[in-house]
Design a protein with these regions (language model features):
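C-terminal cap/linker of serine protease catalytic domains
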Residues: 37-47, 135, 154, 161, ...
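Active-site region of chymotrypsin-like
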Residues: 53, 61, 65, 72, ...
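N-terminal activation segment of mature serine protease catalytic domains
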Residues: 31-93, 100, 147-152, 255-256, ...
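PDZ-domain C-terminal substructure recognizer with occasional recognition of PDZ-binding tails
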Residues: 114, 256-262, 290, 296-299, ...
Length: 362
């Protein structure tokens, strides 16, 4: 069946043309004019295909889902068609513990889908459309090849989907306060609020990232920092933007995600902590109810000094030490500071994948 081409809204075409105009500025003045025109037409078609491959995503979490407390029960965002068989890549938190998922065309039509995979380690979510979408999939590019200030396209999907031009502001490791860490995250500007699951494309229409967060400091306040802490020498002006999970993290695990629903790296220890560095020390921001940390007696405000005897000063160091320390389910020693007193707590970690609820039959 020949893929159906949806109508691109006028505003979207304006943004696509702006992207092409920005790319034109990078051309070599010695290139042949005819070759430039052919290249421009090819890129225009590729960008149109990329925009049409972005769909809306609507999900409803299962009853009593732990994630509903922070993400809500009903969620919406975007996803990108990456396979001719209806395979859609999105950001995992949209479909975490979901019992019902639908894909949304630009004209509002709904297509039922199921969750094929959720990868804790990268944050990716994988969906399978249950009926034909009639669209061309977007090819995967190389996120590592994206260079600073290169014009990029951000596209969200669904009835209110939009297209805009962005630039790569920085590429660096990112540690999330919720026991999450990825390498070489892509930070872009200007910011988009409809970032969840949105596609980040290069000028060839190749997918290079999936939208995850709105961030206050896309440039990185201090070069090389991965804990999100600013201040001190070398500080750069803050610039709001978005964080995209690079598709280079998907390529090595895609077959595994399709076969098992998660990568081997997702079977790791989980404590149920939200942490950040405050005043030079790792502090507990929140403890998930009934989590290992909650059972062990940790509370918001506790300072974490050591984990299994290893001194930690940054959030990424804390998470990586936790995951590298042994089996997902084990006894962990946390040295903490509370009310100016140092004490040691024993925490029995659990396998993160075992804590997630699934719809019946999945």
């Amino acid at each position: 069946m020949k893929p159906r081409l949806s109508t691109v809204p006028t505003v979207a075409w304006i943004m696509l043309l702006a992207l092409l105009a920005a790319w034109l500025l990078t051309w070599s003045p010695t290139a042949a004019a005819a070759d430039q025109v052919v290249d421009l037409l090819a890129r225009s078609r590729a960008l149109q295909r990329a925009q049409q491959a972005v769909l809306g995503v609507q999900a409803v979490a299962v009853e009593d889902a732990r994630s509903a407390r922070t993400l809500g029960k009903a969620r919406s965002g975007s996803g990108v068609l990456i396979g001719a068989d209806g395979l859609v890549l999105t950001i995992g938190y949209l479909v975490l513990e979901a019992e019902a998922v639908a894909l949304v065309h630009g004209d509002g039509r709904l297509v039922p889908a199921r969750v094929l995979g959720y990868d804790v380690a990268t944050g990716f979510g994988l969906l399978q459309a249950l009926t034909p979408l009639g669209l061309e999939p977007a090819p995967l590019g190389r996120s590592g090849a994206v260079v600073a200030e290169q014009p990029l396209m951000i596209a969200s999907g669904g009835g209110d989907g939009a297209v805009s031009v962005a630039q790569l502001v920085s590429r660096r490791d990112f540690a999330g306060y919720w026991e999450y860490h990825i390498e070489a995250a892509l930070f872009t500007a200007p910011p988009r609020r409809d970032h969840s699951g949105a596609g980040l494309f290069n000028s060839a229409g190749e997918l290079v990232g999936i939208g995850s967060l709105l961030v206050a400091d896309a440039a990185g306040s201090v070069e090389g920092r991965t804990d999100g802490v600013g201040g001190g020498a070398g500080q750069r002006p803050q610039r709001s933007g978005n964080l995209f999970v690079p598709v280079d993290l998907l390529t090595p695990i895609l077959a595994e995600l399709r076969a098992r629903g998660f990568s081997a790296a997702s079977r790791r220890a989980w404590l149920g902590l939200n942490c950040a560095v405050l005043d030079g020390r790792i502090r507990v921001l929140r403890v998930s109810d009934d989590s290992p940390a909650d059972v062990a007696g940790l509370v918001a405000g506790d300072g974490i000094l050591r984990i299994d005897g290893t001194e930690v000063h940054a959030v990424d160091q804390l998470w990586k030490t936790l995951w590298a320390g042994g089996a997902p389910e084990r006894e962990i020693s946390l040295e903490i500071e509370r009310d100016n007193l140092v004490q040691t707590l024993k925490v029995f970690s659990v396998d993160r994948m075992k804590t997630l609820k699934r719809a019946k039959g999945i």
